[in-house]
């Protein structure tokens, strides 16, 4: 009888140990095994409606260096980063650099996102990050999350949390 209990307990422990791997195994993977949202992964196919009702699509970003910024109006580090990203667009947009801000929608906004962006001087496209869009980027672990893709659509830099604009710019310049 003790042997049966030990066998059952052993199987239960082994079974539960494998449960922790669900998040990584559910992420979309390329043929080469790179999980979505990880360095070396490709810019996913996505489309969204921006805050003013215009369509944003990954198709429009092909051949450009792209910075995807996941943000929220309640996120203080986001408020610090976004004006710097606008300055990068102003400086490098004519050289094929684009920024798309994807608004994380987990909490009720205390501020209208359009007015929020206007106060910060942000003019690059801003859209709502639906659950589907977040999943295509591999899930979002924290805000802000910044993803920098090269012209071939390969993820070259990923930052979860605040990053200084000059650090992003130093990573951006060689990709242009």
Please report, for each region that a protein language model flagged, where it lies by residue.
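Short pre-active-site segment immediately N-terminal to redox-active cysteine/selenocysteine motifs
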Residues: 64-66, 70-74, 81, 106, ...
């Amino acid at each position: 009888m003790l042997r049966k209990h030990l066998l059952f307990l052993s199987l239960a422990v082994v079974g539960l140990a494998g449960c922790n791997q669900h998040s990584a195994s559910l992420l979309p993977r390329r043929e080469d095994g790179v999980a979505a949202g990880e360095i070396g992964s490709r810019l996913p196919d996505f489309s969204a409606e921006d805050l003013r009702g215009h369509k944003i699509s990954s198709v429009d970003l092909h051949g450009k260096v792209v910075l995807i910024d996941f943000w929220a109006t309640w996120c203080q580090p986001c408020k610090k980063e976004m004006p710097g990203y606008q300055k990068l667009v102003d400086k490098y947009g004519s050289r094929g650099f684009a920024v798309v801000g994807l608004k994380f929608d987990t909490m009720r906004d205390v501020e209208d996102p359009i007015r929020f962006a206007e106060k910060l001087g942000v003019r690059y496209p801003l859209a709502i990050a639906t659950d589907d869009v977040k999943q295509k980027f591999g899930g979002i672990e924290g805000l802000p999350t910044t993803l920098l893709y090269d012209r071939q659509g390969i993820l070259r830099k990923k930052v979860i949390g605040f990053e200084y604009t000059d650090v992003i710019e130093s990573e951006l310049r060689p990709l242009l």
